[in-house]
Swiss-Prot record:
Source lineage: Bacteria, Pseudomonadati, Pseudomonadota, Gammaproteobacteria, Enterobacterales
Active-site feature positions: 1135 (nucleophile), 1260, 1262
Main location: cytoplasm
Enzyme's top EC category: ligase
GO CC annotations, alphabetized: cytoplasm
Keywords: ATP-binding, Cytoplasm, Glutamine amidotransferase, Ligase, Magnesium, Metal-binding, Nucleotide-binding, Purine biosynthesis
Family: In the N-terminal section; belongs to the FGAMS family.
Record domain Glutamine amidotransferase type-1: where: 1042-1295
Protein name stated in the entry: Phosphoribosylformylglycinamidine synthase
Pathway: Purine metabolism; IMP biosynthesis via de novo pathway; 5-amino-1-(5-phospho-D-ribosyl)imidazole from N(2)-formyl-N(1)-(5-phospho-D-ribosyl)glycinamide: step 1/2
Cell compartments where the protein resides: Cytoplasm
Entry's EC annotation: 6.3.5.3
Signal peptide: none
Binding site for Mg(2+): 679, 718, 722, 884
């Protein structure tokens, strides 16, 4: 039976206004829209009055419901029938944890009530199309239609393909019907194999074969034999990549054989809780570094949010499934798309060439895709710290003559680093009889055929198959699985995981054969043991679907009880679905039908399928010399600063958490003005050291339109000039991931790909001492469509994205582009040696040209000398600032440095030649260093020692003020206000934020950037930062116990434990399942801290589901109430813990006036480094800090204080319960965005109880308790930041 319960309003006023404007623009006469959430409960038994009241209260969250009866025509948007939304999975979990077992499933829709003039049926279809994502949702016309969401079908049987009867044609038909993308020789192979076996293949077997042998999974092109211009080539592409490892194996621990590559890290204190006692402590051991970079291009073109989200999620799983289990740590992300054409902000180089109907626009991708990628990382708890963004789309004269080149099929890049124990780097042995396990969520009828679909050019597959290959994301589930993996690797030698892989393309049909095959075993499986939410799925759908957040593992039978205990504690679902066998055979039994859908020798599935041969021709681009007739430097500056590749990327940065883990030493945002210009990302290796890891990206795809090999060399060079900003030492410490995107089969591209791979694999990387131990290829970068009577194609440039990873010697020595105005000198290191080529530059692009001669690596020895010289200068602390030269050239390098320093620049470029346009806009490798004036000679001498004398040019200096002046022999070449340039540079991000977020907030942020008087972040302290007030109490040897409380989805508990640990506490890991299960009580604890993250993925209101699981469980409710009433206890709630505790007001004495925390005013997750002031309040944790102003990490989507009315706010203020407020850089309490990131009244962001024993706050002091973890800080701070005082206050209070 289904019950319907109304929910809160679903759209803010500005979202409704945006919808109305879209309808008006489409000439649809819609006058008014009201939207509210509607909940549908699928019940297995009726609820009594008390249970009904409980369910009703559970579903009350968000803004108060409007009591009126809505007017207008109803359009109900729900998830597509046959799918289960991530919201449903999490909300149903909460209901069950609150004791509502009669609820089989909760689902949510949005009821739109549309008041409109008379519209035709077609116009109503247009209205409906604007309201839903056709890939994920459907539209009903009545609330009761939602019953279709809960219809259960009978299991479907396996179906066979009559190969023996119909011959080869049966396989050809199945290939088309199932979207298998099989090649002719693979069809021959299958015909032969099954004829030999003497039986017909089942659909599930063909599907499994297609996924396992797709280009996506098998990398056929990279393993192919090559004939170029009639000459056989000696090596495959993959062999040339492997050559880098053969030449430079140094520091590599694992390459080419696992889900990620591993290199040597540093010996540090890894901080985690003991399995038996729950007590956190440091464990001194090597923390080796793993690295992986994936792409998720096809799904992102079809449905950008889930496409990018599952792209990030899949890469995170790759890291966790490395060796015998590892820990993902920090991420990177990248996008290449066609022109944005922002409505009302179209740029002169943007022409509309059309697109296929089934893929979305570049603007849609960049509106939704980055949000999906960020949301997954945020909810999982991994900071995303670097990335790139390129737009390109034009008709150009390239290798194949004049044709359309661009990214209608986008690149969505997801990568990152993690850590792994030394004894877990290599996978273990799968013993015969080992239990084969699926860890993670249930099978769902989604994401079918992703591997094969992504191997086709967009436009080749059937529209319904595109629908089928879209996936859905549930990062909170992946977090639970990762917590299990963490518990396993933390056991060291007792780790129950023998072997682990992630489930990705092809689902279990790819993952399970890979697991047993890699372990030298076979497998015997039972289909119906696989967890499934949809009983009507066929065997093919159960075995081959790509439901995310799953891992496959082998665990020895005697270790199963331990594994079961770990999973139950973390509430991570798992199923034992088979046993490892001696014989390398794969069998899948179906209990329901008592048959065998799969019964195959593994070598048929994974054996030597026909090897591909590529017989290709070389084509050379002629290009056209740059026509400079109408180009002035002033106009060029304006245009280039508006090119999205160059322009400010704040809209891509502040949506992503950049502080979780407490180990982020360098994020994108630089300096007191938080300008997104960092060259690389840096993390600390642990919470007790200054060793670390660095990541950077290099990418110069447009250059491939003129010279394939140069483009590849420049990508490596740029990654190197970016990562050189931190202290690494030996260049051999740097390891690269190479992600290759190409339109295989397009004239000239295959030979060009071979050239590019050879240039880096056989030549450049070996010469530099660089290794490429990991990478990926995507070989179908083309879209085809019909535009009127014309057949069109959009082909991407050959695109190599290089990600560089390295161990860092001392994270404190990382340079940024932030200029200093002390007596200084700016020096250009020009690795282009005066070539100043303008082909395929940003300048050429904004004038709709390609040019003829591009930049290149001009001298490999000098590139190596540059890196070594930079390392010597960084270690000697001789540099004040560094920024590489890249898209936009020297002009952009200097401008971004001035933006970061909020200062002026006076430079002279006479030494760079007479061609000022080329000097300013060429994109040759190199960059600008800033040195103290007195160090200039010594620095120049050192650069000369490394062979760079002819590359170094004195430019001028940074000055206080607002002028950006470039001269040549004292004649003005360009002069402008730095603030004006800053505003131009910011306009793209402003327009994107206006479209995507609350336009009022976007306008306020843009206005703030135009304020030259802004002093930037600053610090005023009312206490001595160097005084450790906890020291006398620590000296007694007593360590009070603090319960570090977490719920499923919480992700900030480790750094919280470390902060309390440093202040003299014993931090104990306490999961809500421990309390609910009665394994632990709160009676033994002196302090309680509820940590940040996304409990239950923030469904049913941020923190509200967590709170209700306490309030609706009588025993646990008593436990909390008793703790809060006990004298001599302390409690802290941060972020999600703050939201949760604000919903426990009925249990906490003196908290009656506390507010609720609701959706940010911007309607967006906000990750900021915000300035706050400590106000006078009873809070015991903030004693002695009153009046201090200092920046703090902020990361939340629902942090806006909501009070009942003005009287409530006045009472909260008059009682003095406000503990922290947001202030602007002038020190004034503010409600203006982004200084106040959520719009809270009176800047309120922390409150306390009347006795001061319980304090709750939205910002994260635990993430910045170490100075090194602050995005910016005064130079004179030591190891501890001022926020350490909170934790020391706690220790002092407990005596």
């Amino acid at each position: 039976m289904m019950e319907i319960l109304r929910g809160s309003p679903a759209l803010s006023a500005f979202r409704i206004n945006k919808l109305l404007a879209r309808f008006q623009a489409a000439n649809l006469q819609v006058h008014n829209i009201y939207a509210e959430y509607v909940h549908f409960a699928d019940l297995n038994a009726p609820l009594n009055d008390s249970e009904q009241a409980q369910l009703t209260r559970l579903l009350q969250y968000g803004p108060a419901l409007n009591s009126h009866t809505p007017a207008g025509k109803l359009l109900l948007v729900t998830p597509r029938p046959g799918t289960i939304s991530p919201w449903s999975s999490k909300a149903t979990d909460i209901a069950h944890n609150c004791g509502l077992q009669q609820v089989d499933r909760l689902e949510r829709g949005v009821a739109y009530y549309i008041e409109a003039s008379t519209l035709t049926a077609e116009q109503w279809r247009q209205v409906a199309a604007e309201l839903h994502d056709r890939m994920m949702e459907t539209v009903f016309s009545s609330l009761t239609d939602a019953e279709k969401l809960f219809i259960h079908h009978q299991p479907a049987p396996v179906s066979s393909v009559d190969l023996l009867g119909e011959g080869r044609q049966a396989l050809i038909d199945a290939n088309l019907r199932l979207g298998l993308a099989l090649a002719e020789d693979e069809i021959d192979y299958l015909q032969e194999a099954f004829t030999k076996l003497g039986r017909n293949p089942n659909d599930i077997e063909l599907y499994m074969f297609a996924q396992a042998n797709s280009e996506h999974c098998r990398h056929k092109i990279f393993n192919a034999d090559w004939i170029i211009d009639g000459k056989p080539q000696p090596k495959s592409l993959f062999k040339m990549i492997k050559n880098t490892f053969e030449t430079t194996p140094d520091y590599v621990l694992s390459a080419y054989k696992d889900n990620a590559a591993v290199m040597e890290g540093s010996a540090v204190g890894r901080y985690f809780a003991d399995h038996n006692t729950g007590r956190y402590d440091f464990h001194q051991e090597p923390a080796h570094i793993l690295m992986k970079v994936e792409t998720h291009n096809h799904p992102t073109a079809i449905s950008p949010w889930p496409g990018a989200a599952t792209g990030s999620g899949g890469e995170i799983r790759d890291e966790g499934a490395t060796g015998r289990g590892a820990k993902p740590k920090a991420g990177l992300v990248g996008f290449s798309v066609s022109n944005l054409r922002i409505p009302g902000f179209e740029q002169p180089w943007e022409e509309d060439f059309g697109k296929p109907e089934r893929i979305v626009t570049a603007l849609d991708i960049m509106t939704e895709g980055p949000l999906g990628g960020a949301a997954f990382n945020n909810e999982f708890g991994r900071p995303a710290l670097t990335g790139y963004f390129r737009t390109y789309e034009d008709k150009v004269n390239s290798h194949n003559g004049e044709e359309l080149r661009g990214y209608h099929k986008p690149i969505m890049l997801a990568g990152g680093i993690g850590n792994i124990r030394a004894d877990h780097v290599q996978k273990g042995e799968i013993v015969v009889g080992a239990k084969l396990i699926v860890l993670g969520g249930p099978a769902m009828n989604i994401g079918l055929g992703g591997g094969a679909a992504s191997s086709m050019a967009s436009g080749q597959s059937d529209v319904d198959l595109d629908f089928a290959s879209v996936q859905r994301d549930n990062p909170e589930m992946e977090r639970r699985c990762q917590e299990v993996i963490d518990r396993c690797w933390q056991l060291g030698d007792a780790n129950p995981i023998l072997f682990i892989h992630d489930v990705g393309a092809g689902g279990l049909s790819n993952a399970m054969p890979e697991l047993v095959s890699d372990g030298g075993r076979g497998g015997k499986f039972e289909l119906r043991d696989i967890l499934s939410d949809e009983p009507g799925m066929s065997p093919l759908e159960i075995w081959c679907n790509e439901s995310q957040e799953r891992y496959v593992l082998a665990v020895a039978a005697d270790q199963l009880p331990l594994f079961d205990e770990l999973c139950k504690r973390e509430r991570a679902p798992y199923a034992v679905i088979g046993d490892a066998t001696e014989e390398q055979h794969l069998s899948l039994h179906d209990n329901h039908f008592d048959n065998q859908p799969i019964d195959l020798p593994l070598d048929v599935l994974l054996g030597k399928t026909p090897k591909m041969t590529r017989d290709v021709q070389t084509l050379k681009a002629k290009g056209d010399a740059l026509n400079r007739a109408d180009i002035t430097i002033a106009d060029a500056v304006n245009r280039v600063l508006h090119l999205p590749t160059v322009a400010e990327k704040t809209f891509l940065v502040t949506i992503g958490d950049r502080t979780v883990t407490g180990m982020v030493a360098r994020d994108q945002m630089v300096g007191p003005w938080q300008v997104p210009v960092a060259d690389c990302a840096v993390t600390t290796a642990s919470l007790d050291s200054y060793y670390g890891e660095a990541m950077s990206i290099g990418e110069r795809a447009p250059v491939a339109l003129l010279d394939f090999a140069a483009s590849a060399r420049l990508a490596v060079g740029e990654a190197l000039t970016n990562i050189a900003a931190t202290q690494i030492g030996d260049i051999k410490r740097i390891k690269l991931s190479a992600n290759w995107m190409a339109a295989a089969g397009h004239p000239g591209e295959d030979a060009g790909l071979y050239d590019a791979v050879k240039a880096v694999g056989e030549e450049l990387c070996p010469q530099l001492g660089l290794t490429i131990p990991v990478g990926k290829d995507s070989m179908s970068m083309k879209t085809r469509w019909q535009e009127g009577n014309e057949q069109r194609e959009m082909t991407s440039p050959l695109s190599l994205v290089i990600s560089a990873f390295a161990r860092v010697e001392d994270v404190r020595h990382t340079l940024t582009p932030q200029l200093s105005t002390e007596d200084n000198a700016l020096l250009l290191i020009d690795l282009g040696k005066g070539h100043n080529a303008l082909g395929a530059t940003a300048l050429a692009q904004v004038y709709r040209q390609l040019g003829d001669k591009p930049a290149d690596v001009r001298d490999v020895a000098q590139l190596k000398g540059f890196y070594d010289a930079m390392q010597a200068l960084v270690a000697a602390r001789k540099l004040l600032a560094w920024h590489d030269r890249s898209d936009g050239g020297l002009l952009v390098t200097l401008a971004e440095m001035a933006f970061a320093g909020h200062c002026g620049v006076q430079v002279d470029i006479a030494a760079l030649g007479d061609d000022h346009l080329a000097a300013l806009f060429n994109e040759e490798l190199g960059g600008v260093i800033q040195v103290r004036a007195e160090d200039r000679e010594a620095v120049e001498a050192l650069l000369a020692q490394y062979g760079l004398a002819d590359c170094v040019h004195y430019l001028g200096q940074a000055l206080a003020g607002d002028r950006f002046v470039i001269t040549a022999n004292d004649q003005t070449v360009f002069s402008e206000s730095r603030t004006t340039l800053r505003v131009w540079w910011a306009e793209t991000t402003w327009q994107m934020q206006r479209l995507r977020d609350n336009p009022q907030c976007a306008d306020q942020e843009h206005e703030a950037k135009a304020n030259d008087a802004d002093p930037g972040l600053n610090v005023k302290l009312s206490f001595d930062i160097n005084e450790d007030i906890a020291a006398p109490y620590i000296a007694t040897g007593a360590r009070p116990k603090v319960a570090v409380l977490r719920e499923q989805g919480v992700n900030s508990h480790v750094e919280m434990a470390a902060a309390f640990h440093r202040a003299g506490f014993d931090a104990i890991d306490v999961h809500m399942s421990d309390l609910l299960g009665g394994r632990i009580g709160l009676g033994n604890f002196h302090a309680l801290v509820a940590c940040g993250g996304f409990s239950y993925g923030d469904v049913l209101g941020a923190g509200e589901g967590w709170a209700k699981s306490i309030l609706f469980n009588p025993r646990v409710r008593d436990e909390f109430e008793t703790f809060f009433h006990r004298p001599q206890t302390l409690a802290l709630g941060v972020c999600n813990g703050c939201q949760m505790m604000s919903n426990l007001r009925e249990l906490i004495p003196g908290s009656e006036l506390w507010p609720r925390f609701v959706r940010n005013h911007s309607d967006r997750f906000e990750a900021r480094f915000s300035l706050v002031e400590v106000t006078q309040s009873p809070s015991l944790l903030l004693q002695g800090m009153v009046g201090s102003q200092m920046p703090i990490a902020v990361s939340h989507g629902e942090g806006r204080v909501e009070v009942r009315d003005d009287a409530h706010l006045a009472a909260l203020e008059s009682k003095g319960l406000v503990a922290l407020r947001y202030v602007d850089n002038f020190g004034k309490v503010t409600e203006t965005y982004p200084a106040n990131p959520n719009g809270s009244p009176n800047g309120i962001t922390a409150v306390t109880t009347e006795n001061g024993r319980v304090t709750i706050m939205m910002p994260h002091p635990e993430r910045v308790f170490r100075t090194v973890a602050n995005s910016w800080h005064p130079e004179n701070w030591g190891e501890d930041s001022p926020w350490m005082r909170i934790f020391r206050n706690a220790r002092k209070q407990l005596g």
